[in-house]
């Protein structure tokens, strides 16, 4: 979630021991695109169904199948930890977008 990420960057900036270190800002919890889609459906419209359109599918082998970040080193250096769950971050993002729809081209699929 963006607030956790921003807080992580600020925490790193305030930590002299972090200078020159490679650090990950991450939850340490893996979520698939399916998890994301299902949680969005649960929060926005529980009656929605996922429909795949073949022309929008990416070619096989064009994607990384799994990503999982480990922020152990950051936590040990600074005490940083994420403050938002996956579900809380999505809920806050949905609330923000609902309040700012006029800023987006809703209903247009742009590549």
Over which residues does each language-model region extend?
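C-terminal substrate-binding subdomain of Rossmann-fold SDR/epimerase-dehydratase oxidoreductases
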Residues: 1-111
């Amino acid at each position: 979630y963006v607030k956790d990420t921003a807080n992580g960057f600020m925490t790193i900036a305030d930590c002299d021991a972090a200078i020159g270190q490679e650090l990950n800002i991450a939850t340490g919890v893996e979520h698939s695109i399916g998890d994301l889609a299902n949680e969005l459906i649960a929060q926005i419209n529980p009656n929605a169904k996922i429909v795949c359109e073949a022309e929008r599918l990416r070619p096989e082998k064009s994607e990384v199948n799994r990503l999982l970040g480990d922020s152990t080193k950051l936590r040990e250096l600074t005490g940083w930890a994420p403050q938002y769950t996956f579900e809380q971050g999505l809920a806050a993002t949905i609330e923000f977008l609902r309040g700012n729809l006029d800023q987006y081209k809703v209903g247009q699929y742009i590549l």
